[in-house]
């Protein structure tokens, strides 16, 4: 299979974290797959990267293949294991209102050699915690759009929407502005482009609590709500227990949407694939084929990698 940029793609990398009560879970983990449905852990299931700055934890792991070569990994700067008692009084409202206004980041040319960790100062002083950064490369303007969920002081940190900022180098960033907002609270935005259409997946926290899909011919919208997608999501058992969307094209050309399910015992939590017959067709259905993970992957990103990259990762992290 070839991507739109012509890269021969024969495998997949899934970056993610683990939901554990110990701090080693909230770090950066790698897994790989040849078919996009059955993943195997790398590095013996131990972290690839460990945060030593900010909150000393990484959640909501994002990875981007840079158009100039190499990759950047960006994460939410948050450790529930380290900080929930000390900083947040076991209160998620405190997390939302007083959490980090930076993102953790590492740069790498080859997914093996990494730069020193950085804290990216993207946020504003009036932001609460900045959740789930994701990056979209705007080819027309040759810049990266970073989007994430945050509350703000002006509404007493009660209404999360999707903000965005643009950068060309992940060193300087434009002033954050709203990217997508609704009357209800939303989070976990995932943005992809197929053909000439932009597809935005996100999670409604309420009214109703479930994953949504919207689409537009323009990167900055307006986005049209996909009622058929909402109708199908509403038929799932515990529709509000899915979050953290990430999507990619399978080797046979079908479109895979991964959703992180947390509506069960912790040992069984993790991603579930939903499959559409063709890219751009949002008629997703829960996967009936075999899929497997060595443990429950939590909020992460799947990217396409070459067979050479796959072999190199397997050899280095064996």
Description of each model-found segment:
Residues 1-318:
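Carbohydrate-active catalytic/glycan-binding domains of CAZyme proteins
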């Amino acid at each position: 299979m070839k991507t739109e940029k012509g890269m021969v793609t024969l495998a997949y990398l899934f970056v993610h974290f683990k939901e554990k009560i110990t701090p080693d879970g909230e770090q950066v983990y790698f897994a790989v797959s040849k078919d996009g449905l059955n993943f195997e852990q790398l590095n013996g299931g131990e972290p690839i990267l460990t945060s030593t700055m900010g909150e000393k934890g990484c959640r909501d792991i994002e990875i981007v293949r840079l158009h100039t070569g190499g990759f950047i990994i960006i994460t939410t700067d948050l450790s529930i294991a380290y900080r929930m008692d000390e900083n947040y009084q076991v209160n998620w409202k405190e997390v939302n209102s007083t959490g980090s206004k930076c993102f953790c980041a590492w740069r790498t040319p080859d997914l093996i050699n990494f730069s020193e960790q950085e804290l990216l100062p993207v946020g504003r002083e009036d932001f609460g915690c900045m959740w789930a950064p994701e990056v979209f490369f705007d080819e027309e303007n040759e810049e990266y759009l970073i989007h994430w969920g945050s509350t703000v002081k002006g509404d007493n940190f009660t209404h999360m929407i999707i903000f965005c900022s643009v950068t060309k180098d992940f060193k300087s960033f434009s002033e954050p502005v709203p990217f997508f907002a609704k009357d209800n609270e939303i989070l976990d935005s995932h943005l992809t482009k197929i053909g000439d259409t932009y597809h935005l997946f996100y999670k409604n926290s309420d009214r109703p609590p479930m994953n949504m899909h919207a689409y537009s011919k323009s990167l900055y919208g307006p986005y049209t709500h996909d009622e058929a997608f909402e109708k199908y999501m509403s038929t799932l058992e515990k529709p509000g227990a899915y979050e953290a969307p990430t999507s990619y094209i399978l080797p046979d050309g079908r479109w895979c949407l991964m959703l992180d399910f947390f509506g069960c015992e912790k040992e069984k939590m993790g991603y579930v694939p939903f499959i559409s017959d063709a890219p751009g067709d949002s008629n997703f259905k829960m996967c009936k084929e075999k899929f497997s993970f060595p443990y429950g992957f939590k909020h992460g990103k799947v990217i396409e990698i070459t067979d050479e990259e796959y072999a190199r990762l397997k050899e280095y992290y064996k």
